Amino acid sequence: MDEVLLLTGGISITTRALRALLATGATVAVFSPRGEPLGIFMRPVGDATGAKRRCQYKAAEDGRGLQYAKSWVFKKILGQRDNIKAWRRRLRGYSQYAESLAKALPGAGLHGAMETPRRRRRGQDGGQAGVRGRPTHPPVPPGAGRRSPGGAPRGQEASLRRDPQRGQSSGALHMYVIVVYDITENDVRAKVADILRAYGLARIQRSAYVGRLPPALVKELAERLARAVRGANADIAIFKVDKRTIDTSLRIPPRPPAGHVALH
């Protein structure tokens, strides 16, 4: 229930009491002895000013304030629509670029380029240690070593052990991944390049890397890149290529904030 305070003639109120009354949120109105409204005290809230309150009164009197508010909201919506259209055009360019790279994969001779950093990483700490952050097994070339009772070489058996955290074989590198980025800061670009190389991706263009990763590591890579470019003026698009084809039915997200990573 709203509390109404009526002050009749001959009643005075101190400034401290009036300030405390306004702080509670009560509306204090001043009337003439004839009952005519003279004004309303303004609450001491944030950026409230006399000019703003006067504009509110005028808007309430002639009804144009609602029209102005609707016009302002409509213009904001149109501005967001333009932002989404701009991002959609940019994303379409990323998609076309990645699709052209995917078509060039079979004859580009990229297998050796991707295998070199992967072998270097396996030689440093074995297995996927550079990705999971812990050593697993020493590098054993395929076919080397004694065979296990199941018939597979012990090196292959060790490399195909299931990762309990991901629930799949750590050696199942079967999906092509294309990473395209647009980064202005040199230090952030270098950080992103180091991360991509650590995951075994090979650089094929100035702002494009390609490699083969299991699906679980693709999501992990996207999260790590998002942390690396957080707060920077950077856009990164990750395209998962299955059987050297790209799904062109991409969802168009709203305009991303600074440091955006899109996973498709």
UniProtKB/Swiss-Prot annotation:
Alphabetical list of Pfam families matching this protein: Cas_Cas1 (PF01867), CRISPR_Cas2 (PF09827)
Protein keywords: Antiviral defense, Endonuclease, Hydrolase, Magnesium, Metal-binding, Nuclease
Enzyme Commission code(s) on record: 3.1.-.-
Biased composition (Low complexity): 143-155
Cofactor: Mg(2+)
Chain sites annotated for binding Mg(2+): D182
Keyword Amino-acid biosynthesis belongs to the record: no
InterPro entries: CRISPR-assoc_Cas1 (IPR002729), CRISPR_associated_Cas2 (IPR021127), Virulence_VapD/CRISPR_Cas2 (IPR019199)
SUPFAM superfamilies reported in the protein's UniProt record: TTP0101/SSO1404-like
One GO MF term attached to the UniProt entry: RNA endonuclease activity
Quaternary structure annotation from Swiss-Prot or TrEMBL: Homodimer, forms a heterotetramer with a Cas1 homodimer. Can form a Cascis complex with Cas4 and Csa1.
Protein name: CRISPR-associated endonuclease Cas1/endonuclease Cas2 fusion
Origin species: Thermoproteus tenax (strain ATCC 35583 / DSM 2078 / JCM 9277 / NBRC 100435 / Kra 1)
